[in-house]
């Protein structure tokens, strides 16, 4: 089984997140996508963070594809770093092939994540295009550090067969929606 792991605060989740999930399912040939709602992000302020329960419920309302499973298994870990969470997921599911999925906007700061190199060396990564990120991702620390591991977008459907480090940048429809902008509009 091939599973995409799509993690984030989703504060709030929106149609742009659903679009990323849809693109990942289609282009990566996933059997499932686990939408991992995190209790908190160590790189972001918690002051405007909606409750985990509210964010999970909002994600579940947004999701219509039965292959997408909204999960909050990080809840038992508290605020966890992605590398630790992914290691636990992999250990509990040794026969599943995982792909880490993220929006291109996160690629610019990926090098600030704890154990980011370990993530890239353990999981194939699919980076989904976002407005304003298409060109800047090429100069990101991660893109440069793992430039030799980048596969052609036409091969995205076989990313799961690649041994990490391996990553792909996927172009496609982009949503201008932003959780930050949505929160700011509701102030």
Curated annotation (Swiss-Prot):
Database matches in Gene3D superfamilies: HUPs
Coiled coil: none
Pathway connected to this protein: Cofactor biosynthesis; NAD(+) biosynthesis; deamido-NAD(+) from nicotinate D-ribonucleotide: step 1/1
E.C. no: 2.7.7.18
GO molecular function: ATP binding; nicotinate-nucleotide adenylyltransferase activity
UniProt KW keywords: ATP-binding, NAD, Nucleotide-binding, Nucleotidyltransferase, Pyridine nucleotide biosynthesis, Transferase
GO annotation terms (biological process): NAD biosynthetic process
Catalytic activity: nicotinate beta-D-ribonucleotide + ATP + H(+) = deamido-NAD(+) + diphosphate
CDD domains listed in its UniProt record: NMNAT
HAMAP family per UniProt: NaMN_adenylyltr
Function, in words: Catalyzes the reversible adenylation of nicotinate mononucleotide (NaMN) to nicotinic acid adenine dinucleotide (NaAD).
Family: Belongs to the NadD family.
Protein name (database record): Probable nicotinate-nucleotide adenylyltransferase
Origin species: Agrobacterium fabrum (strain C58 / ATCC 33970) (Agrobacterium tumefaciens (strain C58))
């Amino acid at each position: 089984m091939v599973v995409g792991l799509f993690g984030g605060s989703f504060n709030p989740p929106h149609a742009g997140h659903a679009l990323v999930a849809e693109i990942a399912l289609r282009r990566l040939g996933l059997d499932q996508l686990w939408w991992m709602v995190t209790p908190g992000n160590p790189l972001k302020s918690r002051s405007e963070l909606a409750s985990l329960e509210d964010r999970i419920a909002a994600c579940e309302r947004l999701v219509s594809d039965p292959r997408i499973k909204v999960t909050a298994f990080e809840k038992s870990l508290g605020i966890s770093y992605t590398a630790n969470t992914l290691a636990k997921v992999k250990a509990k599911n040794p026969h599943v092939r995982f792909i880490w999925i993220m929006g291109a906007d996160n690629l610019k700061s990926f090098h600030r994540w704890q154990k980011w190199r370990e993530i890239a060396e353990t999981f194939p990564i699919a980076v989904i295009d976002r407005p304003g990120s298409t060109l800047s991702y090429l100069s990101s620390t991660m893109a440069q550090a793992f430039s030799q591991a980048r596969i052609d977008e036409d091969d995205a459907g076989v990313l799961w067969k690649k041994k990490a480090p391996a990553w792909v940048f996927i172009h496609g429809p982009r949503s201008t929606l932003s959780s930050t902008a949505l929160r700011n509009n509701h102030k």
